[in-house]
Regions:
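Phosphate-group recognition and catalysis centered on beta-loop-alpha active-site segments
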Residues: 1-281
Length: 281
């Protein structure tokens, strides 16, 4: 049975996601970890994966026609649902009539979840990283987080220091994932006065320069490596222990499309080193 990430306060979240030598390496489910019978951005898919191991759930937030926040990666319904056309041209009631489709094009019984539903389900189980699509106002996402009192289980994904600064000004207690490809990126974040303990660094889809990793770790900032795509393919070819090597070389969180395989490698790494966390049980 998978262990849960049990966080009660936003301070627990800062503590759990601050780098130290004993940090607990984690798998992040890219788009929620779709697999056969389990579509992307579906609560049932999150639950399936969370039953196997402690997970971060990366998911995508869009607006319906009537301004409901729903989980959907594409701006159209065609690829992942039984519907057609734009997400933003359908009301929530219309979206709820559709079924989600898995990556093999199989229709599942599952429905498009709202952000509310996801946060209500995930509290005390998982950490969400929310990829907020471009026309969605940060304010509306923050309102839902506040209503659900889900501050302890959410990280907001940003793609520039400007976006990170905006989120921090709107909600100074929320954790932020920011793109950090070099030391200049880190300097720009520091200029926005975002404290290190409220940051995760997305270092990109190739391993970060060791010097950058060291500086981030010295700041207590954990590094997310995007293995989705190229590095996942390498691991499938060379053997899944490659995932543990990424961790050994300074990644802390792996955003992957192979959560089972990455999770097995990380579990082995964790056991071998006797890593524990009071927040994972």
């Amino acid at each position: 049975v998978g262990k849960r990430i049990q966080l009660t306060t936003v301070e627990d979240l800062y503590q759990f996601l601050t780098y130290d030598d004993n940090r607990y390496p984690l798998v992040s489910l890219h788009r929620g970890g779709p697999t056969s019978g389990y579509p992307e951005n579906a609560l049932e898919t999150f639950a399936y994966n969370a039953g196997l191991q402690p997970v971060i759930v990366e998911c995508d937030v869009r607006l319906s026609k009537d301004s409901a926040l729903v989980l959907m990666h594409d701006n159209t319904l065609n690829r992942t649902t039984t519907g057609r056309g734009s997400v933003s041209e359908r009301t929530l009631a219309e979206l709820k009539k559709l079924r989600l489709v898995d990556n093999n094009k199989k229709i599942t019984p599952y429905k498009i979840p709202t952000l509310d539903e996801a946060l209500a389900w995930g509290k005390g189980k998982v950490i969400f990283t929310l990829d907020i699509k471009n026309d969605v106002p940060y304010e509306s996402v923050i309102n839902v987080i506040r209503q659900q009192r889900a501050e302890s289980s959410v990280v907001i994904i940003t793609y520039s220091a400007g976006q990170a600064g905006k989120v921090h000004n709107l909600a100074g207690d929320l954790m932020i994932s920011a793109s950090v490809k070099n030391l200049d990126d880190l300097a720009r974040l520091n200029e926005k006065d975002i404290p290190d303990n409220k940051l995760l660094a997305f270092v990109g889809t190739r391993e970060a320069d060791p010097q950058l990793t060291k500086v981030l770790h010295d700041h207590g900032i954990m590094c997310i490596l995007g293995t989705q795509g190229n590095l996942d393919k390498q691991a499938a070819k060379k053997g899944f222990q490659l995932y543990a090597s990424f961790i050994e070389r300074g990644a802390d969180i792996l955003s992957t499309d192979q959560p089972k395989e990455a999770g097995r490698a990380l579990n082995f790494y964790i056991k071998k080193r006797g890593i524990t966390s009071k927040f994972v049980q």
